[in-house]
Structures are given as structure tokens and as C-alpha cells.
């Protein structure tokens, strides 16, 4: 233990760069974009939370695709080894290579995969056709806008060049299309068998791939069960 008034410090310190984003002092736009560039972290936390509470195989597969996408990004960066712009003004960044942008690749994978899921995987099951299409269009527009803004933030904050975020977006989009096709054609037919495994039953892993609109299904089933229990409770009180 150090004596009073003395500190024994390590020779060097390293920051946790996962949430470390720098922006120009006094720049409000840069400040907002710095927070926006943390979107991938928020999305990953959301996925983990969703998997813990829903335990659905397609969600697990989606997260697996995101992890694979990050691995591909790391591999491409270390093959190309293109430096970041301006000689690397951010000394605490995780890697000195910038081609392609991992933030851009992540966000475009997430947005394009979600876009394909909304329009090709989820199908209309009720009569509110207009409202169903409206919320899909609005959500898709929001996802694509978020992907663009996160990509733009990496250029604005001098973490990447335009070409680096552009190629990151292209790589993420292509990975999303490939992973969506692989999930639909290869993994989805296996989901019922995987859900029947003893370990899956132990952890309450479920498969909803045969349900066209999970949101509508869960809503109707929950509402019907709540009404049924309410009737039973009313009968007991009489």
C-alpha cells in the first residue's frame, strides 16, 4: 500500500475505446454526432436484452450475423491497412486502420437486414393494410437515416474518409443481403429441430419462423389469454 500522500501509478494507461468518442470542443453538431456514433453499442445492448427476454432463434441468428460482419470488417482492415485521415488525430482509437469503417459497415448491415426482414419476412395478417405499410415505411426510413447519420458522423469527426465509410456501407449491405439469404434458406428450416433440442428446451429457446407476423401474434394471444383469465377471475368472485 502506498504511503499517505503518495500514489503508485502504472507506467502507462489505456482507455476503453468502445465508447470513447472525441469531438471538437464547443461544436454542438460534433457533440450530437459523437453521441449518435455510439448507436452500434446501443444496438448490441438491445440485442442482448432482447435475447435474454425473448430467446428467439432468429434474433440470435441476427446477432450472429452482426458479429460475423464485425469479424469480416476486422479482417479487411488488416489486409488493406489504409490509415485514418489527417494522420490519425484520435490517438485513443482502437485501431489505426480505417478502411472500411466498422461503424458504417455495422449500421448498414443492421439497417439493410432489418429492411429485408420487414418487407420479406413479416407479412400482413390483419385488415389494417394501410397502417401496416405506413409503420414499415416509417421504420425503414428511420433505419436508413440512422445508418447515413452514423456514417456521416465518422467523417465529420475525422475518424474516417468518405471512401472508408462508403466502402463500409457497401460491405455491410452486401453482408446483410448474404446473411439474410443464408438465414432464410439454410438456417430457418433447421430452427424447429434446434428448438427441440434438450438444451434449447432447458433455456426456453423458441422458434417463431413459421409465424408470419410475430408482433401481431403475440398481441392477439396475450389479449385473448388476459380476457380468458379475467373471465375466470370474475366467475370466482361471484
Swiss-Prot record:
A single GO molecular function term of this UniProt record: dolichyldiphosphatase activity
Coiled coil region boundaries: none
Membrane-crossing residue ranges in chain numbering: 33-53, 100-120, 130-150, 162-182
Source taxon at top rank: Eukaryota
Keywords (A to Z) from UniProt: Endoplasmic reticulum, Hydrolase, Membrane, Transmembrane, Transmembrane helix
UniProt pathway: Protein modification; protein glycosylation
Membrane topology label: Multi-pass membrane protein
Enzyme Commission (EC) number: 3.6.1.43
Catalysed reactions listed for this entry: a di-trans,poly-cis-dolichyl diphosphate + H2O = a di-trans,poly-cis-dolichyl phosphate + phosphate + H(+)
Enzyme class: hydrolase
SMART domains: acidPPc (SM00014)
Alphabetical list of CDD domains matching this protein: PAP2_dolichyldiphosphatase
Major location category of this protein: endoplasmic reticulum
Function: Required for efficient N-glycosylation. Necessary for maintaining optimal levels of dolichol-linked oligosaccharides. Hydrolyzes dolichyl pyrophosphate at a very high rate and dolichyl monophosphate at a much lower rate. Does not act on phosphatidate.
Annotated family: Belongs to the dolichyldiphosphatase family.
PANTHER family: DOLICHYLDIPHOSPHATASE 1, PALMITOYL-PROTEIN THIOESTERASE/DOLICHYLDIPHOSPHATASE 1
Name the UniProt record assigns to this protein: Dolichyldiphosphatase 1
Organism this protein belongs to: Rhinolophus ferrumequinum (Greater horseshoe bat)
Amino acid at each position: 500500500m502506498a504511503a499517505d500522500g503518495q500514489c503508485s501509478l502504472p507506467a502507462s494507461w489505456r482507455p476503453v475505446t468502445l465508447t470513447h468518442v472525441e469531438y471538437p470542443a464547443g461544436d454542438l453538431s460534433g457533440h450530437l454526432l459523437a453521441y449518435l456514433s455510439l448507436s452500434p453499442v446501443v444496438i448490441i445492448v438491445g440485442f442482448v436484452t432482447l435475447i435474454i427476454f425473448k430467446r428467439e432463434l432468429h434474433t440470435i441468428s441476427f446477432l450472429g450475423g452482426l458479429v460475423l460482419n464485425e469479424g469480416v470488417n476486422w479482417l479487411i482492415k488488416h489486409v488493406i491497412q489504409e490509415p485514418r485521415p489527417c494522420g490519425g488525430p484520435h490517438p485513443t482509437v482502437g485501431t489505426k486502420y480505417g478502411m472500411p469503417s466498422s461503424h458504417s459497415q455495422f449500421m448498414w448491415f443492421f439497417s439493410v437486414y432489418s429492411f429485408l426482414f420487414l418487407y420479406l419476412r413479416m407479412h400482413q395478417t390483419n385488415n389494417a393494410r394501410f397502417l401496416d405499410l405506413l409503420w414499415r415505411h416509417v421504420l425503414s426510413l428511420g433505419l436508413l437515416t440512422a445508418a447515413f447519420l452514423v456514417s456521416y458522423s465518422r467523417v465529420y469527426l475525422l475518424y474516417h474518409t468518405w471512401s472508408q465509410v462508403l466502402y463500409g456501407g457497401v460491405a455491410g449491405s452486401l453482408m446483410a443481403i448474404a446473411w439474410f439469404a443464408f438465414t432464410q434458406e439454410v438456417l430457418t428450416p433447421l430452427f424447429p429441430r434446434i428448438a427441440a433440442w434438450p438444451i434449447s428446451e432447458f433455456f426456453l429457446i423458441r422458434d417463431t419462423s413459421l409465424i408470419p407476423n410475430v408482433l401481431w401474434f403475440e398481441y392477439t394471444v396475450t389479449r385473448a389469454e388476459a380476457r380468458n383469465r379475467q373471465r375466470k377471475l370474475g366467475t370466482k368472485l361471484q
